[in-house]
């Protein structure tokens, strides 16, 4: 009998630089595909791929890079974002060659789409546009407030004293990664996602990104000592902005270290991070496949 459903297990924010693979709870083995939404292992792209393969246990794993997958290991480490992506792809190719089949796929802005049977997977890191900086700011209705908050947030985030470590730990060919680089890359990746979603596909579509497509997922941190501009760092409002007919069936993301599972129109949006203590190893999402003629 033909397969009628596909079962996807989402996972993200594994941080193998902090924990051993054996410390991760055993995954429900009923899944068909492991969807890895980034931050597998800081600065060690080969280990990131190898760990995903180990967790999947011979089943397909589909991966996007998280911000911390692209961190260098100190000022003497000159690897750039492009180099990290190349190393991730190379290790995936080695693993596939060893298995004599495609057991792991890395999706990125340069290669964002793959298909497994009837299911289309689209994946990018989805850096944020920094437009959500005013989310927690009172009187945020005025457009001027949005722009001013975003500009101030980018300035604070880009400063070595007050900003996230990624702006010291990630490198480009031009130098250190900056909030403006993130804004530019968000625009590029947003266009790539939209173009892919606009293409015809007969069957379910799953999007995998590291950063969140819904800004409200950052609200779990409100009042917990994080900067006022934190929503801008964690996500954008890309999913609500999409027309209903372009929305995927499932959107898997990470970056926020809290479980998240909501419905946005036809899309179920899920984060299932290992970091944060809320990981559910039995969270398997079942999508119906189109019935084929008998």
Residue map of PLM features:
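A structural motif corresponding to the C-terminal end of an alpha-helix
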Residues: 91-105, 192-204, 240-250
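A basic- and aromatic-enriched beta-loop-alpha substructure that forms the phosphate/nucleotide-
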Residues: 60-138
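N-terminal active-site segment of His-dependent metallophosphoesterases
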Residues: 1-64, 68-77
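Active-site-proximal loop/helix segment associated with metal-binding centers of metalloenzymes
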Residues: 122-206, 211-229
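Active-site environment of divalent metal-dependent phosphoester hydrolases
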Residues: 15-22, 41-46, 68-75, 110-115, ...
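Binuclear metal-dependent phosphoesterase catalytic core
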Residues: 2-4, 115, 219-250, 256-294
């Amino acid at each position: 009998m033909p397969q009628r459903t596909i079962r996807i297990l989402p996972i993200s924010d594994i941080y193998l630089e902090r924990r051993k693979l054996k410390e991760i709870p055993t995954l429900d083995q009923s899944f068909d595909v492991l969807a890895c939404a980034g931050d597998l292992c800081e600065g060690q792209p080969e280990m990131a791929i190898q760990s995903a393969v180990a967790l999947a246990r011979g089943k397909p794993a589909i991966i996007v890079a998280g911000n911390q997958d692209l961190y260098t290991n100190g000022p003497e480490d000159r690897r750039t974002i492009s180099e990290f992506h190349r190393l991730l792809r190379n290790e995936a190719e080695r693993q596939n060659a060893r298995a004599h089949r495609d057991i792991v796929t890395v999706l990125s802005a340069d290669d964002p789409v793959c298909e497994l049977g009837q299911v289309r997977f689209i994946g990018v890191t989805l850096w944020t546009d920094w437009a959500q900086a005013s989310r927690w700011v009172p009187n945020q209705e005025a457009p001027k407030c949005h722009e001013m908050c975003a500009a101030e947030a980018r300035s604070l985030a880009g400063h070595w004293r007050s900003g996230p470590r990624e702006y010291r730990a990630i490198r480009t060919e031009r130098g250190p990664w900056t909030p403006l680089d993130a804004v530019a890359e968000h625009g590029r990746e947003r266009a790539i996602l939209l173009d892919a979603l606009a293409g015809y596909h007969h069957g379910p579509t799953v999007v995998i990104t590291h950063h969140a497509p819904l800004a409200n997922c950052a609200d779990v941190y409100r009042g917990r000592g994080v900067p006022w501009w934190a929503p801008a760092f964690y996500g954008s409002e890309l999913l609500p902005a999409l027309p209903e007919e372009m929305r995927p069936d499932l959107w898997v993301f990470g970056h926020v270290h809290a479980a998240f599972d909501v419905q946005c129109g036809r899309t179920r949006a899920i984060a299932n991070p290992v970091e944060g203590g809320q990981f559910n190893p039995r969270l398997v999402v079942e999508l119906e496949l189109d019935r084929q003629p008998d």
